Structure formats: C-alpha cells, structure tokens
Amino acid sequence: DRIYAYAFDYHEKGNITDAEIYYKFLCIYAFENHEYLKDFASVCQPKKKYQQAYDLYKLSYNYSPYDDYSVIYRMGQCQIGDKNIDNAMQCFYHIINNCEDDSVKSKAQAYIELLNDNSEDNG
C-alpha cells in the first residue's frame, strides 16, 4: 500500500517518470491487480507509449471484476495516438453498444463523430 501511495502521489503531482517506475514494480509484484495495470497504463499514455498503454489497459479490463468501460475508452484513445483509427472506432462502438454509463457513452460518441468528420474531410 505504501508503494502504491508513492506511485499515486508522483502521478498526481505530474511526475510520471517516477510514477511509472513504481507502477511497473507494483505490476510485477501483483500482476493481476487491475488497478495497478490501469494506473501503469495511465502513465504510459502521456509518454506516447501508446501500444504499451493499450496492452496494459486491455489486461486491466480483462482482470477487472466489473466492466469498466472507461478503460476501453482509454484504449480507443491509445489507438488514435498510434493512428489505428479503425481499431479506435471499434473501441468506441463497443462502448456505445454495451456501456450503461451515459458519461462514458457520450465521450465515445463524441470521438466517433469527430473521427467520422475527419475521415469525410480526408476521404
């Protein structure tokens, strides 16, 4: 718990490099802890380690005892960062079709509309 507190504190203060070190250690120590995986992913994403963040988010979602669609939303963002627009759209449509949280659904819908508008402008 203390190590997690350090990682969380570094993360909250914007020191994602140190937070990443602690989260990585926590994931090695307790690999099936979905919160550690999600938090580790959340420090990889702003460092533009999109594939690593995506993989960690996916593991987090799979190990989670509940359907946390905010994780799939972040997976979609990582796919956008890696310019995998079709994969991003799949993530966002999965949210629209399965999620009951209107807040997450509306964010996913906004990305779908934005990506569709961009594809029409570029197409």
Task: List the model feature ranges, each with a label.
Residues 12, 46-47, 81, 114-118:
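Register position in tetratricopeptide repeats
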Residues 1, 116-123:
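Eukaryotic alpha-helical solenoid repeat scaffolds
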Residues 54-60, 88-95, 123:
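Alpha-helical repeat scaffolds
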Residues 80-103, 109-116:
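TPR/TPR-like (Sel1-like) alpha-helical repeat modules
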